[in-house]
Amino acid sequence: MPVQKFLKTFLWLVAIHSCLVGIFLIILPESWLAFFGYIGYRRSFFQVQGGVFHLVLAITYLWAARNPLRDQSLVIITICAKGIATFFLLLYYLLIEPIWIVLLSALGDFLMGSIILILFINLKKQNQPAKEVS
C-alpha cells in the first residue's frame, strides 16, 4: 500500500477514534465513571467540553486525511495535537491522579502521533523531487 494511502486510512481511523471518544465523553452516564478510575468524580461541563473538543479534532483529522500531501499543515496540527495530549495526560497521571484510563489514553495518543509522524516523514521523502546527478 502506498504511503499516502496508508496515511489517509490511518488518519480516518484516528478521526473515527476521536469522534467515538468525543461522543462517549458527552453521553457517558455518571454512574460509569468509577469503572474508568474516576472515583468520586461528578459529571461536569468540562467532561462535555472535552467531548466536543474531540469532535472538533476529528474534523481536523478528516480534513488532513483528504489529501495529506496538499494539506500538510493539517497533518502537522494532528501530530502536535497528539504530542500535546500525550504530554498532558502523562503529567496528569504522574503528578495529579494515577487514573488507569488516563495512562492508557496517553499511550494511545503517543502511538497514534508516532505512526502519523513516521508516515508523514516517509510521504514527504517519497514525494521529493529527484536530485540531478552531474
Go through the PLM ranges and name each one.
Residues 19-24, 44-65, 77-83, 87:
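Core segments of alpha-helical transmembrane spans in multipass integral membrane proteins
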Residues 26, 62, 90, 114-117:
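Membrane-embedded alpha-helical segments of multi-pass transporters/permeases
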Residues 28-29, 37-38, 68, 93-97, ...:
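Short helix-capping/hinge motifs at transmembrane helix termini and TM-loop junctions
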Residues 35-45, 73-77, 98-108:
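Non-cytosolic membrane-interface motifs at loop->transmembrane helix junctions
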Residues 66-69, 87-104:
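Membrane-helix boundary connector in multi-pass membrane proteins
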Residues 75-89, 105-116:
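Hydrophobic alpha-helical segments of small multi-pass membrane proteins
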Residues 111-134:
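Membrane-water interface at the C-terminal end of transmembrane alpha helices
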